[in-house]
């Protein structure tokens, strides 16, 4: 359930600016997942010296290796700054999980001293109104669907596009996309989802980001989350 929008140039500017402004020599960087973060990972390999990365997915690890960035782990290093994208940025809240990597993305971001987001203008919104991805234990997905619908949402098990069956995350979860329409109280929805038996992690990142780098046609705008 990836969200379309934004040009490659806008994404490149956001990713490169975040690396230039946020990453210092010898830093350990949390490497998010997605098309905008891909530009940041390439910039790390090209511009930053003695930097290592903690990958949030198989894809971000592969991009890091291709870029020449040393890959480490949370067991071996503390994360100085995490750089990640978002499906939506709205008033202190991020929605993530379009790439089905939000479980690892959340705990890497939470472990970092600083968490910055890279995005294009299409991801900005005044209200949280895109479906919220929820990673679930495979056997529990019917329970999660029932509970989400009891909360007033519409829940859909995410199907894979290039194979039969559902999407399976790098951590072995299935993904249920939960549409609540416009969410007036993201904190309450986040708490309700966390309390559902079988939920591994949801894609609402409330109050976690420190800054958002938005790539535009004219340059980069840095804003509060």
Swiss-Prot record:
CDD domains: RPI_A. The keyword Transferase does not apply. The keyword Isomerase applies. The active site is at 105 (proton acceptor). It catalyses: aldehydo-D-ribose 5-phosphate = D-ribulose 5-phosphate. It is an enzyme of class 5 (isomerase). One of its GO terms (cellular component) is cytosol. Pathway: Carbohydrate degradation; pentose phosphate pathway; D-ribose 5-phosphate from D-ribulose 5-phosphate (non-oxidative stage): step 1/1. GO terms for biological process: D-ribose metabolic process; pentose-phosphate shunt, non-oxidative branch. Substrate binds at residues 33-36, 84-87, 96-99, 123. Its EC number is 5.3.1.6. PANTHER family: RIBOSE-5-PHOSPHATE ISOMERASE. Catalyzes the reversible conversion of ribose-5-phosphate to ribulose 5-phosphate. Homodimer. Belongs to the ribose 5-phosphate isomerase family. This is Ribose-5-phosphate isomerase A. It comes from Halobacterium salinarum (strain ATCC 700922 / JCM 11081 / NRC-1) (Halobacterium halobium). The gene is rpiA.
């Amino acid at each position: 359930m990836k969200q379309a929008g934004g040009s490659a140039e806008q994404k490149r500017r956001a990713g490169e600016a975040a690396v230039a402004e946020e990453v210092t020599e010898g830093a350990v960087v949390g490497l998010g997942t997605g098309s905008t973060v891909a530009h940041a990972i390439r910039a790390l390999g090209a511009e930053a010296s003695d930097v290592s990365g903690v990958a949030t997915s198989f894809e971000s690890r592969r991009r890091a290796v291709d870029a020449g960035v040393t890959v480490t782990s949370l067991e071996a290093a503390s994360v100085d700054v995490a750089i990640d994208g978002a499906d939506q940025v709205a008033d202190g809240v991020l929605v993530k999980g379009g790439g089905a990597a939000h479980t690892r993305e959340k705990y890497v971001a939470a472990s970092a001293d600083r968490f910055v987001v890279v995005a294009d203008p299409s991801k900005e919104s005044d209200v949280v109104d895109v479906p919220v991805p929820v990673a679930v234990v495979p056997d529990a997905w019917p329970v999660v669907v029932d509970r989400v619908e009891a909360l007033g949402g519409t829940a859909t098990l995410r199907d894979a596009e290039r194979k039969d069956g559902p999407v399976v995350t790098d951590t072995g979860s299935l993904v249920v996309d939960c549409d609540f329409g416009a969410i007036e109280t993201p904190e309450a929805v986040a708490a309700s989802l966390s309390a559902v038996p079988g939920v591994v992690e949801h894609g609402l990142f409330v109050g976690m980001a420190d800054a958002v780098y938005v790539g535009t046609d004219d340059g980069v705008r840095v804003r509060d989350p």
